[in-house]
Amino acid sequence: MAVNVDAEYLKEIEKTRRDLRALISSRNCAPIMLRLAWHDAGTYDAKKKTGGANGSIRFKEELNRPHNKGLEKAVAFCEEVKAKHPRVSYADLYQLAGVVAVEVTGGPAIPFTPGRKDADSADDGELPNPNEGASHLRTLFSRMGLLDRDIVALSGGHTLGRAHKERSDFEGPWTQDPLKFDNSYFVELLKGETPGLLQLKTDKALLDDPKFHPFVKLYAKDEDMFFKAYAISHKKLSELGFNPPRRIPSAVTQQTLGIAVAAAVVIFTICYEASRRGK
């Protein structure tokens, strides 16, 4: 069903944002909320124009798939907020939860444009397999219409949370403080394996691949640059399968312009660093 993004809907979005901020802070559930947003959006197929950020993960058929183990808790948390703001679509709610999860843990502000439609059935779509390497990551992310720089930036989201044996057959956090959003994921990658910290095959692929590696080095060195890149890529992820309304509030338009400028800065820096190494 179409979402009418009028003034009242925008007010509901802001109230929803406040309630999500309070819930995520009080429950320490930022990692699982970020995972929910990613898994709902990550089913997108750019060629087929199917899947994406459409709230379909609320359906049992999708929620019960092996790669979504544990997310029923995040869906339940969101239901508490949905009960207060029934007009807000599930698709908007789940993506806003991911945005807020990053912000309340110290990460960058991510522009959010509401208006996503809810799916009426579960999506198909493969998500990353932690036992695979760089070619697997490229295949999945290119299916979504995302690029190498998006793969590396979004992988930095592993700075939040930990893997659980009962969900993924892996156990442990990626960083020393799994409730703080920073660039430590990349710092730890460059340090090599550390007792008690997790490095999956998909993580190590970022080091081994010659196109991924420069981004890892840059983000480990410059947290501000990582934050800018992450905000760009997270916004893209949150809008997979969604065409934002043409008429949006000026504040949102200004934020989007800022993201575009930041993207240019990141790309320029990568090229500059590469040219320096080539001299």
UniProtKB/Swiss-Prot annotation:
InterPro entries: Ccp1-like (IPR044831), Haem_peroxidase (IPR002016), Haem_peroxidase_sf (IPR010255), Peroxidase_I (IPR002207), Peroxidases_AS (IPR019794), Peroxidases_heam-ligand_BS (IPR019793). Interacts with AKR2A and AKR2B. It is an enzyme of class 1 (oxidoreductase). One of its GO terms (cellular component) is peroxisomal membrane. K(+) binds at T159, T175, D182. A motif (AKR2A-binding sequence (ABS) required for peroxisome membrane targeting) lies at residues 272-279. Its cofactor is heme b. The active site is at H39 (proton acceptor). The keyword Zinc does not apply. It comes from Arabidopsis thaliana. Its EC number is 1.11.1.11. The record marks R35 as: Transition state stabilizer. It is found in: Peroxisome membrane. It catalyses: L-ascorbate + H2O2 = L-dehydroascorbate + 2 H2O. Binds one cation per subunit; probably K(+), but might also be Ca(2+). Plays a key role in hydrogen peroxide removal. One of its GO terms (biological process) is hydrogen peroxide catabolic process. Binds 1 heme b (iron(II)-protoporphyrin IX) group per subunit. The gene is APX5. Belongs to the peroxidase family. Ascorbate peroxidase subfamily. GO terms for molecular function: heme binding; L-ascorbate peroxidase activity; metal ion binding. Heme b binds at H158. Keywords: Calcium, Heme, Hydrogen peroxide, Iron, Membrane, Metal-binding, Oxidoreductase, Peroxidase, Peroxisome, Potassium, Transit peptide, Transmembrane, Transmembrane helix. PROSITE patterns: PEROXIDASE_1, PEROXIDASE_2, PEROXIDASE_4. This is L-ascorbate peroxidase 5, peroxisomal. It is a single-pass membrane protein.
